[in-house]
Structures are given as C-alpha cells and as structure tokens.
C-alpha cells in the first residue's frame, strides 16, 4: 500500500467502516484490514532490510528446536582429512568423526502503530499507508540492528583486523580490499579443494564509496577513472572490485551507529589513526550465517483504542541470528 496510489473502492469502504462509531462494526473492519496488510508487511520486513542478503532465513516448524549441526571438520583440521596410498592389500584406515551442534535462541520482536479514528472515518487512506510504512520500518530497523550486532560480535571474536599501512588515515584504497581478500583466504580454513574461504562482499560507509570516485592516477588508469566518473551509484565500477561486491550502509562510518557499537560496546578497535570500519564476509560458503524464523510477522487490530477514539495495529514475530563459523567474517579499517 503506497501513499500516492489510491486503493480500490472496496478498501475505501472498508476503511470508512473501520472508523464507525459502532464498535462492533469498527472492530470487524479493522480485523479485515489487519489481515489484508499482514502479507505486504511480512514481505517488506523480510526483504526490505540489509541483513537478509547475508543471513539465510530458515523458517521452522512449530515446536522445532533451532539446532544447527556444525561442520564435521573442526576449524584448522581440514588438511588432516586426506586419502591414503593403498599398496593393494591390507585394511583401509578408519577415521571416526562426530559432529556437534549449536542452538540459536529465538526471541520475540514486537511493534505497534495507531492514529486518530477520524482519519479512517473520513477515508484518509494516505494516513493508513504512512502508518503501515512506519510499522514496517520499526521491524526492519530492529532486524537490521540485531543482525549486524551479531555480525560485529563475530568479527570482534575472530580478533583479526586488516589495514593498509601505506595509506593515509581515512583513505579507502584498493590495496585494503586486496589485503582483506588475501587474509580471508589464508585464514578461512581449508585448501584449494576443501572449504576455501573467499571474501565475496564488503560492507563500508558511503564515504568509502565516494573515495573511489576520487582515486588518482596512482590508484586507477585513465580508462577506469572515466568509467568511475560516468557510473551511477549502483554502477559496477563503484560496487565491484576484484570480484568483491561493495555495499555502502549508513550505519557504518566515523561516529555512526554500528561502528560505535563495534568500538564502545564490543571493545573492538581500529588501527591507530584509522577512522572507519569495513566488514568483509564470505557469502560463497553458505554454512555460517543463519536466521531461524519461528514465527512470521503477524498483524492484529487493537480493540482497546476505540474508547480513546483511535485506531491501531500491532504485530509480532519470533526470529534469531547466529554465526556458526566466524572465519566467514573479517574486519578492516582505513
């Protein structure tokens, strides 16, 4: 439901009835509106945020425990699982392995919104549309924060920080990307065949993306610079370097929310004189970032508001976040 597109006449009539002075009529109409808005809101919450591109959503059956098996190969032992030369007779060596599991706790996420009953009675549908946008935005913000707090905690726990020692403070360089790619491969476990780590995506601030536009001839040749100058914000020259996808998010940057959480709440640190954080993730191996969903978003009408001449809706969901292998995430600074 958008603020600029007029809904159908049936919905307008339903909206008018939801503002009726007859409480029974109003509540019945509000219940229909809540169910009509539930599916669009659910889609917006699941696909309108910046973490579902990283975490794999896993809907669970009612009563199912959010347990996830860990890899049979313990971190750092991949090279020990090798085959043997058989001389032609004799017993083949046995190797016994037993996998462990981790349980990712889920929790409830709730939000609500309400507005004056007269807006519904007068069929002021743009107010309802804006109210639903605010309700959706509250869920999205909460999911973003919880998901990124989990990612940043895993990055701090890994205790590896990559930086370009030759770059000026606050300068985002392609060498930093190259160094992070190398560190991710060398410290990601495995070998050329078994579970190799590779940094596929890098999350940075909008200022870092703008730094690319200001790279000089020591960073880019003239042809590449021209492509950068002419590209849009989503253009490949700005968003893909060395096969690594670049994503700019507002919450990362000097003095921004996620960077402050990384430093002040988690005790992480940047290299001396560096001012911004970047986060690299390996999304080629989909074995680490999980998002169990026990309950999809549900929306209900708030019957108690009719006495105050207001109309409102509330909703809840039950989700969780987990990083099963922190070798799939890497922090850097510039």
Where do the protein language model's features map onto the residues?
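Structural beta-strand/beta-sheet cores of well-ordered domains, especially the beta-sheet scaffolds
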Residues: 111, 195-200, 309-311
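Alpha-helical scaffold segments that mediate packing/assembly in large oligomeric complexes
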Residues: 115-192, 333
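Extended, solvent-exposed, turn-rich assembly/linker loops in the middle of proteins
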Residues: 156-234
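Intrinsically disordered, low-complexity terminal tails
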Residues: 1-35, 333
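Assembly/oligomerization interface modules of large self-assembling protein complexes
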Residues: 36-109
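Residues forming anionic-ligand binding surfaces in small-molecule and nucleic-acid pockets
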Residues: 106-118
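Short, flexible loop/turn elements at secondary-structure junctions
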Residues: 117, 206-208, 317
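Sequence/fold signature of self-assembling virion shell proteins
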Residues: 4-5, 12, 215-334
């Amino acid at each position: 439901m958008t603020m600029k597109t007029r809904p159908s006449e049936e919905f307008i009539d339903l909206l008018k009835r939801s503002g009726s002075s007859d409480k029974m009529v109003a509540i019945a109409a509000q219940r229909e509106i809540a169910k009509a808005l539930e599916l669009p809101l659910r889609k917006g919450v699941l696909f309108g945020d910046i973490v579902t591109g990283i975490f794999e959503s896993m809907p669970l059956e009612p009563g199912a425990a959010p347990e996830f098996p860990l890899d049979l190969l313990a971190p750092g032992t991949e090279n020990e699982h090798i085959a043997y030369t058989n001389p032609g007779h004799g017993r083949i060596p046995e190797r016994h392995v037993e996998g462990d599991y981790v349980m990712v706790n889920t929790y409830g996420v709730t939000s609500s919104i309400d507005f004056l009953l007269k807006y519904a009675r007068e069929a002021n549908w743009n107010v309802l549309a804006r109210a639903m946008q605010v309700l959706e935005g509250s869920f999205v913000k909460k999911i973003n924060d919880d998901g990124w707090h989990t990612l940043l905690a895993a990055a701090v726990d890994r205790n590896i920080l990559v930086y370009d020692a030759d770059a000026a403070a606050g300068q985002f360089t392609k060498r930093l990307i190259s160094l992070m790619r190398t560190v991710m491969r060398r410290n990601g476990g495995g070998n050329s065949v078994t579970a190799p780590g590779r940094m596929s995506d890098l999350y940075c601030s909008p200022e870092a993306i703008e730094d690319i536009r200001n790279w000089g001839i020591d960073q880019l040749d003239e042809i590449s610079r021209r492509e950068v100058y002419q590209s849009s914000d989503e253009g490949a020259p700005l968003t893909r370097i060395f096969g690594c996808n670049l994503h700019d998010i507002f919450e990362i940057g000097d003095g921004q929310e996620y960077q402050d959480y990384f430093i002040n709440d988690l005790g992480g640190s940047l290299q001396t004189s560096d001012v911004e954080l970047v986060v690299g993730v390996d999304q080629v191996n989909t074995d680490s970032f999980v998002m169990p969903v026990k309950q999809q978003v549900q929306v209900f009408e708030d019957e108690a508001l009719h006495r105050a001449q207001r109309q409102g809706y509330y909703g809840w969901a039950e989700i969780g976040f987990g990083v099963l292998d922190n070798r799939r995430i890497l922090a850097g600074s510039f």
